C-alpha cells in the first residue's frame, strides 16, 4: 500500500501545483477527485503510513488550543512609505549616492497578511505571522490549509521564505454571503477576512475559505544575486509568485508602471494598496543596508487613500503616555475603505488652526496609511457656523494646566502623576512590542489602576494571583494565567524592558541597538550621551532623551525596584565583544566584496569588537573597501582615515 500512497501523493501534489501555481491543469477536476478519494480511503485503512506531504493535510479537522509565539530567525522589517512622485525621486537620489547605476524591480503590494514559511530538508515545519517583525505567532496548521503553499519542496532544502497571504475577491464574496445567510456579521474587507481566517482555531474553517498566497523573498541567505532571479527561483520551488512586475532603470519607468497598475487595480482578482520598489541587485542592497526600522534599498508607494465627506459633531480630547493631548473628531458615520468610520484623528491643536476647523463643519475624511481615520480638510462651501472649536486649557485627566511649547505642535500635560499618562504607560509596558504580558490588556490595566493595585510598572511585578480576583469579571483560571504571564515576562531580554519604559524617542529598534551595544540597562544608565549618539542609526536626539530620563531620581528608583522584583536587565542576544582586536573602533564598510557577503563582513567586524556604522565622519577609525567603493572611500581619503581591503579583514 505504501507504494501506491506514494504514487498518489506525488500525482496529486503535481496536479495541485499545475492548478494553483501554473494555472495550467493537465487533468480534469473529476480525475483529481477520483485519485483524491482513493488516497483518503488508503490513509483511513493505513493511518500509520500517512505521508507528511499528503494533500489530505489541507482539509478537515483539527481544533487548536491557541497560537504559540515564534521568534523569527530573520527579522521582518517594515518598508518606508512614499505617497508622491517627489518622494520616489528623493528615494532614488538617496540610493544613487551609494549605488552609481541602480536597476529597480517593481512588484505589486498585496493587501494581505505578511507570513514567513520555514522548510527543513524540504518539508514545511513552520508558518508564522509577521507580528512585530521579531516575534510572530506560529500558525503552521492553518497555513497548511492554504492550498497553494507547498507542504514539501522538490529539493531537500533548509530555507525560509516570505510572502503575503490574502483572500481573493471571489472568495471574500462567497464567505460574506455565507455569513449573511447564517446571521453572522460580514467582514469589512478581504484583508480583515484573511486576518480573521488565519486566527481561526478550527483549521477546517481555514480550509473552506480558499486563502491564497504570493511569495516574494527568500529570507534565509540567498545564493541568487538579484531579486528577480530570487523570484524565479521561488517559482521553480513551487511557490506562487506574482507575475505582474518590471525591471526599471529610473523613476520615469517606475512612475509609468505605477500609473498602469493604478488603472488596472479595480480589475485585479485581489486587493493591492500600492507598488513596492526595490534595488534589484542583492549586493547593492547589502551596501545600502538598513535604518532602525526599514531597508534603505526599498520603498512602498501607496496609492492615494479613498476620501469621504462627513459632518463634525464634537471633539474628544485624550491624554497619551507622554502627556500629549490629542483631539479626536466624532463624525456622522461614513463607509471608508470597507469599514464604517465615525471617529477620526484631528492630530493636534496646530493642525486644527492650520485647517481652520470649526464647529459643525463638513470635513473630508480619509484613512492615513490605509489604517487610521483622519480629517484631511474642511469643505468650506458647506460651512454652517463661524464658531471656533473649544480648545482645552486644562488636562482632561488631572486638570493641570496644559502647555503649548514653541517647538511643539501639540498641547502637553507635564504632571508626572497624571492618571491618564500613568495608565497609558502601564498599557504600553505590557503591550506585545514591549514586555508582551499576555492578557494584561487595557481593560485589566484600567481595573488594576482604579483599584489602586498598580501605580507604576514595578507594581505589576508585586501582584499576586489573589489580587486579580479582586477585579470584576476575573476568575481563578484567568488570574493564574495573568500571574504566570507576568512572571514569564521577567525573563525577557532587556531591550523589551527598555522599550516598555516609554522613554521619549526610544522605540523598539533603537532599544535593541542600544542593548546590543551596552549589554545591559545598568551599563546604558552609566554611559555618556556622546557614546550613545555615536551608535549607528541612533544620534543626538535619542542620546539627549536617555540622558534626561536617567537624570531623574525616579528612574534610578524604578530600575532598582524592577531588579529587586526579579526583572532581567541584561541583553540576551548577540552582544559586541569588548576586548577584541578592533574593540572600540568605528568601522565603515563600502563597495562590493568579492568573497564575503556584507552581512558576514559586518558580523565579523562586530565579533572583533568594532562598531559598524553607515557613514564616514571624523569619528570613523577605519574604512573597509571593496570594488566600486565610491564617495565613502573618497571622503575617507580626504579625512585621512585608514583604509583596508577584504583580504585584510579575512586575515584577522
From Swiss-Prot:
A biological process term (GO) from this entry: DNA repair
Parts of the chain that traverse the membrane: none
Top-level taxon in the UniProt lineage: Bacteria
SUPFAM superfamilies on file: BRCT domain, DNA ligase/mRNA capping enzyme, catalytic domain, Nucleic acid-binding proteins, RuvA domain 2-like
EC number(s) on file: 6.5.1.2
Listed GO CC annotations: cytosol
Domain BRCT span(s) in chain numbering: 577-652
Residues forming the catalytic site: 109 (n6-amp-lysine intermediate)
InterPro entries: BRCT_dom, BRCT_dom_sf, DisA/LigA_HHH, DNA_ligase, DNA_ligase_AS, DNA_ligase_CS, DNAligase_adenylation, DNAligase_N
GO molecular function, a single term: metal ion binding
Role played: DNA ligase that catalyzes the formation of phosphodiester linkages between 5'-phosphoryl and 3'-hydroxyl groups in double-stranded DNA using NAD as a coenzyme and as the energy source for the reaction. It is essential for DNA replication and repair of damaged DNA.
Family indicated by similarity: Belongs to the NAD-dependent DNA ligase family. LigA subfamily.
Name of protein: DNA ligase
Organism annotation: Streptococcus pneumoniae (strain P1031)
Amino acid at each position: 500500500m505504501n507504494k501506491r500512497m506514494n504514487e498518489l501523493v506525488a500525482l496529486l501534489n503535481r496536479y495541485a501545483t499545475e492548478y494553483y501555481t501554473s494555472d495550467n491543469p493537465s487533468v480534469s477536476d473529476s480525475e483529481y477527485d477520483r485519485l483524491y478519494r482513493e488516497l483518503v480511503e488508503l490513509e483511513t485503512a493505513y493511518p500509520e503510513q500517512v505521508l507528511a506531504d499528503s494533500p489530505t493535510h489541507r482539509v478537515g479537522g483539527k481544533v487548536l488550543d491557541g497560537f504559540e509565539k515564534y521568534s523569527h530567525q530573520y527579522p521582518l522589517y517594515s518598508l518606508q512609505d512614499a505617497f508622491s512622485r517627489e518622494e520616489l525621486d528623493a528615494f532614488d537620489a538617496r540610493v544613487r549616492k551609494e549605488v552609481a547605476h541602480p536597476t529597480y524591480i517593481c512588484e505589486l503590494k498585496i493587501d494581505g497578511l505578511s507570513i514567513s514559511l520555514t522548510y527543513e530538508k524540504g518539508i514545511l515545519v513552520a508558518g508564522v505571522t509577521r507580528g512585530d517583525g521579531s516575534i510572530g505567532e506560529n500558525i503552521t496548521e492553518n497555513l497548511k490549509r492554504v492550498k497553494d503553499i507547498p507542504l514539501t519542496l522538490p529539493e531537500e532544502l533548509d530555507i525560509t521564505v516570505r510572502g503575503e497571504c490574502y483572500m481573493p475577491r471571489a472568495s471574500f464574496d462567497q464567505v460574506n454571503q455565507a455569513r449573511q445567510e447564517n446571521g453572522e456579521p460580514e467582514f469589512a474587507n478581504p484583508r480583515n477576512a484573511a486576518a480573521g481566517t488565519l486566527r481561526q482555531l478550527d483549521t477546517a474553517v481555514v480550509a473552506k475559505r480558499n486563502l491564497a498566497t504570493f511569495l516574494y523573498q527568500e529570507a534565509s541567505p540567498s545564493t541568487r544575486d538579484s531579486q528577480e532571479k530570487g523570484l524565479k527561483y521561488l517559482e521553480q520551488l513551487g511557490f506562487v509568485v506574482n507575475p505582474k512586475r518590471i525591471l526599471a532603470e529610473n523613476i520615469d519607468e517606475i512612475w509609468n508602471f505605477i500609473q498602469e497598475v493604478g488603472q488596472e487595480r479595480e480589475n485585479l482578482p485581489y486587493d493591492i494598496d500600492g507598488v513596492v520598489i526595490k534595488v534589484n541587485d542583492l549586493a547593492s542592497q547589502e551596501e545600502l543596508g538598513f535604518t532602525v526600522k526599514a531597508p534603505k534599498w526599498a520603498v512602498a508607494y501607496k496609492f492615494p487613500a479613498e476620501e469621504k465627506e462627513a459632518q463634525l459633531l464634537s471633539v474628544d480630547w485624550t491624554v497619551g503616555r507622554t502627556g500629549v493631548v490629542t483631539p479626536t473628531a466624532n463624525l456622522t458615520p461614513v463607509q471608508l475603505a470597507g469599514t464604517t468610520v465615525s471617529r477620526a484623528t484631528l492630530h493636534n491643536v496646530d493642525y486644527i488652526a492650520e485647517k481652520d476647523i470649526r464647529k459643525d463643519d463638513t470635513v473630508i475624511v480619509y484613512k492615513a496609511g490605509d489604517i487610521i481615520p483622519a480629517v484631511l480638510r474642511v469643505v468650506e462651501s458647506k460651512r454652517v457656523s463661524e464658531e471656533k472649536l473649544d480648545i482645552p486649557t486644562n488636562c482632561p485627566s488631572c486638570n493641570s494646566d496644559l502647555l503649548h511649547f514653541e517647538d511643539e505642535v501639540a498641547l502637553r500635560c507635564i504632571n508626572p502623576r497624571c492618571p491618564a499618562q500613568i495608565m497609558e504607560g502601564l498599557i504600553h509596558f505590557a503591550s506585545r512590542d514591549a514586555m508582551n504580558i499576555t492578557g494584561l490588556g487595557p481593560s485589566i490595566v484600567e481595573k488594576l489602576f482604579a483599584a489602586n493595585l498598580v501605580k507604576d510598572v514595578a507594581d505589576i511585578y508585586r501582584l499576586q494571583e489573589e489580587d486579580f480576583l479582586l477585579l470584576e469579571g476575573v476568575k481563578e483560571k484567568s488570574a493564574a494565567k495573568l500571574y504566570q504571564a507576568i512572571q514569564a515576562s521577567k525573563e525577557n531580554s532587556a531591550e523589551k524592558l527598555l522599550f516598555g519604559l516609554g522613554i521619549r524617542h526610544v522605540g523598539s529598534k533603537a532599544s535593541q541597538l542600544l542593548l546590543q551595544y551596552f549589554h545591559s540597562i545598568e551599563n546604558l544608565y552609566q554611559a555618556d550621551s556622546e557614546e550613545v549618539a555615536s551608535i549607528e542609526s541612533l544620534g543626538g536626539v535619542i542620546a539627549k532623551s536617555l540622558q534626561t530620563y536617567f537624570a531623574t531620581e525616579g528612574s534610578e528608583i524604578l530600575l532598582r525596584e524592577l531588579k529587586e522584583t526579579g526583572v532581567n536587565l541584561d541583553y540576551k542576544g548577540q552582544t559586541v565583544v569588548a576586548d577584541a582586536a578592533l574593540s572600540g573602533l568605528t568601522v565603515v564598510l563600502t563597495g562590493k566584496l568579492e568573497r564575503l557577503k556584507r552581512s558576514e563582513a559586518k558580523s565579523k567586524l562586530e565579533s572583533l569588537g568594532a562598531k559598524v556604522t553607515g557613514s564616514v565622519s571624523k569619528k570613523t577609525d577605519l574604512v573597509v573597501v571593496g570594488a566600486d567603493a565610491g564617495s565613502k572611500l573618497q571622503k575617507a581619503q580626504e579625512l585621512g582615515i585608514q583604509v583596508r581591503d577584504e583580504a585584510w579583514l579575512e586575515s584577522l
